[in-house]
Amino acid sequence: MSPKRLDRVAPPPVQVEWDVRFGTSEAAKGWDDLCAHAAGATRRAFELMRSDPRPPEDGTHYRLRGALASREFAGRILEQWQIKVSGAGRIWYLPDDDKHAVWVVYASPAHPKQTE
């Protein structure tokens, strides 16, 4: 997705921050829905991914378990983390140490079917 006229301007990362990018087209579509559903919580999740994508785990932010704990992305296996943004809203992302980036691979106000 190339930015166009009237699109949001993404803030450039500073050296200590991680670059947050979409890893799938579905995540890019779901991001706007999630922002409309829970703007404040989605912003807090964005800031957390950007500043500390592997914080101490708690009830709303943790690495996924089992078969979902890792995901292949761009030919490499990366850890897969989840942030609970709302009752059902979720963000799944992959911290990429080599690129100092976070790849958002799922974002939606709906609960992911893979975890049901």
Residue ranges and their predicted role:
Residues 1-89, 95-116:
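Basic, Lys/Arg-enriched alpha-helical interface segments
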